[in-house]
Swiss-Prot record:
GO BP terms in the entry: glutathione metabolic process
Record family assignment: Belongs to the GST superfamily. Theta family.
Presence of the UniProt keyword Transmembrane in the record: no
A GO term for molecular function: glutathione transferase activity
Ranges where the GST C-terminal domain occurs: 86-207
The protein's name in its UniProt record: Glutathione S-transferase 1, isoform D
Sequence ranges assigned to domain GST N-terminal in this UniProt record: 1-80
Species the sequence originates in: Anopheles gambiae
Catalytic activity: RX + glutathione = an S-substituted glutathione + a halide anion + H(+); 1,1,1-trichloro-2,2-bis(4-chlorophenyl)ethane = 1,1-dichloro-2,2-bis(4-chlorophenyl)ethylene + chloride + H(+)
EC number(s) from the headed UniProt entry: 2.5.1.18, 4.5.1.1
Keyword Lyase: yes
Quaternary structure note: Homodimer.
Keywords tagged on the record: Lyase, Transferase
Length: 209
């Protein structure tokens, strides 16, 4: 199973943890966006949107990290704990995945990426929105072990990849005790977490040092 990725990318790390959780070995294909490797004709045939992560499973190409996570959990999961079949439980997992994509990860990008890639000054309004996003997650976690209940799901793996990026960027989790406790549980219990940490550290070394 080919996996086109960059280790520093939080979405790529979320897929790597999901693959570890379902026991699937990925054939890693480093894809350097800075060198334009995602624009090569052979890659565009696989993914005309030319983004990573991209997974190719026996000729079936799929991109968008959360779609890949769902695919891996449904096809290769040994049970439904990672992605529950119960409609309401699954709906909560989906909501958390969409929250990560549209709010938590996006607000990190909105605040940090203009500084990293365009050398713009920090935007206090975007910083507040980023903190608000972590506050939402802190509320979601009230009274439960994980993001969608008391079992670790693919939502936690996606969120943990994002929060690991917040961590290496120096975000202070002290005002968000539920997030801090949950993140410690993810570090201890998420399959493949070492890959996530290594990738987050690489992101820091490349873009935040």
């Amino acid at each position: 199973m080919d996996f086109y990725y960059l280790p520093g990318s939080a979405p790529c790390r979320a897929v790597q943890m999901t693959a570890a959780a379902v026991g699937v070995e990925l054939n890693l294909k480093l894809t350097d966006l800075m060198k334009g490797e995602h624009m090569k004709p052979e890659f565009l045939k696989l993914n005309p949107q030319h983004c990573i992560p991209t997974l190719v499973d026996n000729g079936f190409a799929l991109w968008e990290s959360r779609a890949i996570q769902i695919y891996l959990a449904e096809k290769y999961g040994k049970d439904d704990k990672l992605y529950p079949k119960d409609p309401q439980k699954r709906a909560v997992v989906n909501q958390r995945l969409y929250f990560d994509m549209g709010t938590l990860y996006q607000r990190f990008a909105d605040y940090h990426y203009p500084q990293i890639f365009a050398k713009q000054p920090a935007n206090p309004e975007n910083e507040k929105k980023m903190k608000d996003a972590v506050g939402f997650l802190n509320t979601f976690l009230e009274g439960q072990e994980y993001a969608a209940g008391n079992d670790l799901t693919i939502a936690d793996l996606s969120l943990a990849a994002t929060i690991a990026t917040y961590e290496v960027a120096g975000f202070d989790f002290a005002p968000y005790p539920n997030v801090a406790a949950w993140f410690a549980r993810c570090k201890a219990n998420a399959p493949g977490y070492a890959l996530n940490q290594a990738g987050a550290d690489e992101f820091k070394a490349k873009f935040l040092s």
